[in-house]
Amino acid sequence: MAIKKSGHYGLSSFYAEQAVSNKLMVFCFTNAPAALAPHGAKKSLFGTNPICFGVPTGKVPFIYDASTSMINRGIIRRADKLGLKIPYGVALNKKGRITTNAKEALQGTQLPIAGFKGSGLAWMVDILSGVFTLSLIHI
């Protein structure tokens, strides 16, 4: 199933839990507005593009739910609101320098998990989301 013109759908594992409880395997993902720089870049090109995979496996299902960024954007927003620092190496400021300042990170860009591998996953999600829904691809 593909859903067009959707917004933030919340925690992906919520949907995976529903599927696996009905003995179904699920793979869900979505693209998002640019907030993630590809490996080696200093400007946002991809969204944080969450990925979720779930499989019923007996008593306890296997569910993997993660974004392609090193840290969830909501955590950065919360840190900004509370005046807290974010971990080193997860975001760049608008000048392309690593920052631990949440406000600067929100004005800059986030970094991908696993370097070029995370960039590849973000690109894959962006392309598949666009193709499956006949929608805009952000790249």
Regions found by a protein language model. Give the residues of each.
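Short, hydrophobic/aromatic alpha-helical segments in well-folded domains
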Residues: F14-Y15, T109, I127
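Conserved phosphate/anionic-ligand binding catalytic regions in large, soluble enzymes, centered on
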Residues: I113-L121, V125
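Conserved small/polar residues in nucleotide/adenosyl-binding loops
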Residues: I137-I139
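A long, hydrophobic alpha-helical segment
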Residues: T100-G115
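A generic, well-ordered mixed alpha/beta core segment in the N-terminal half of proteins
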Residues: M1-G58
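Short, well-ordered loop/turn and helix-capping segments at boundaries between secondary-structure elements
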Residues: I127-L134
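Phosphate/diphosphate-binding glycine-rich loops and adjacent basic-rich segments that engage nucleotide
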Residues: A35-K103
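Structural motif
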Residues: M1-A2, K23-C28, P50-C52, V60-I63, ...
